[in-house]
Amino acid sequence: KYNKLANTNKIVILNTPNTKGNRDDYSFGDEENIMMNSLLKYSDLMVTMFSTMQIEAALFDLPVVNYALREIADADYKSTRLDPQGVMKMPHVSRILQTGGVKAATTFEELYSHINDYLDNPALDSKGRKIIEENFVGDFMGNGSEKTADYIHSLLYT
């Protein structure tokens, strides 16, 4: 259904990542990393279903609309825990939503409205995206291993 959407709408670009490995242990090649960075830098908007990529999007101040539409859910969400709207209640997702830096749509009407709002005003919710950057990214600057070791050391010797 996503391919059909992309094939029938010129403005929709569907990117399917080229990964190496299996579902539990995969990585992106250099070309895929370049493509992903280009998408983040040059896109007008990201539409996703609560992907962690919304954190990277915040680094580029890229507006994000998440969708949780039961009408297009592949699973029987009434008898399983795969309710697309249930994802919004997961702690790691709700913390992102609480920043006000992204939008979530539970109906097609909301989806269209949020998309149009961001296309009309890309700066909308920019302050919230800055909060995502500050709260979820951190200052690693190439010394993440050292900071991790220092933290473990502090736990052991305090």
Predicted regions and their residues:
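Catalytic binding pocket for nucleotide-activated donors in carbohydrate/polymer assembly enzymes
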Residues: 52-139
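C-terminal alpha-helical cap of glycosyltransferases
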Residues: 141-158
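A structural signal for well-ordered alpha-helical segments within the folded catalytic domains
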Residues: 34, 109, 142-146
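Donor nucleotide-activated moiety binding/catalytic core segment of transferases
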Residues: 2-55, 59-60
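Context-gated lysine
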Residues: 1-4, 10, 20, 41, ...
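Hydrophobic helix-cap positions at the C-terminus of alpha-helices
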Residues: 2-5, 118, 155
